[in-house]
């Protein structure tokens, strides 16, 4: 599933091609995504793109009439292509632009979303979200106070969007390894120093992944069709049985909340 770095990579890739151009119309080939494509998107006509923003794993296209909210789901990607390039089997939505380009949404599993909203503060998919991990709001004091009394294992706790947004399975595993914290420790067991270390580690891991264009494990592609290269730098995720890059002890895996977790028992405490 595309996580925050992949969504931010997509945002940065499409922004120069959209802002200042006008959406002439939308082409919806299959509206049956996680939720049906909003009827307002079907009816789009002559709407200039004012900005391309991101909140958590949602891309937000600001138009004079409202906002398009895009979620990439499990397997979605966005590419900027020539308008005359024929659509393929899993190309479900196009935004045809005034500059001769098209923003094309591809999603083999169809678990993404294209929604319409006139007031972001009232959006049901955005209103409950916690702070952005790269913002000043996500601080050592915030994370430490938030963890008090929480018996939940720290890894699934970090993946709760009410705690912090955009830290999915890959980056939670990687950040906990770099911080030296076992993923099954209760969140309430974090010391204030460990909370600070974890915050700085999460920020660093996410920023490094964004610099590398995200992580491509299966379906994710950047807006130019290239894969993300952070997969080559993964320390523990997907490496069960392989030697730890620090101590050579085999990487272990376990299940937390139906998701695989990867860690080094020697390097993490």
Swiss-Prot record:
Its cofactor is Zn(2+). SMART domains: Fapy_DNA_glyco (SM00898), H2TH (SM01232). The active site is at residues 2-3, 57, 259. Binds 1 zinc ion per subunit. It holds the Pfam family Fapy_DNA_glyco. Coiled coil: none annotated. Belongs to the FPG family. PANTHER family: FORMAMIDOPYRIMIDINE-DNA GLYCOSYLASE. This is Formamidopyrimidine-DNA glycosylase. The gene is mutM.
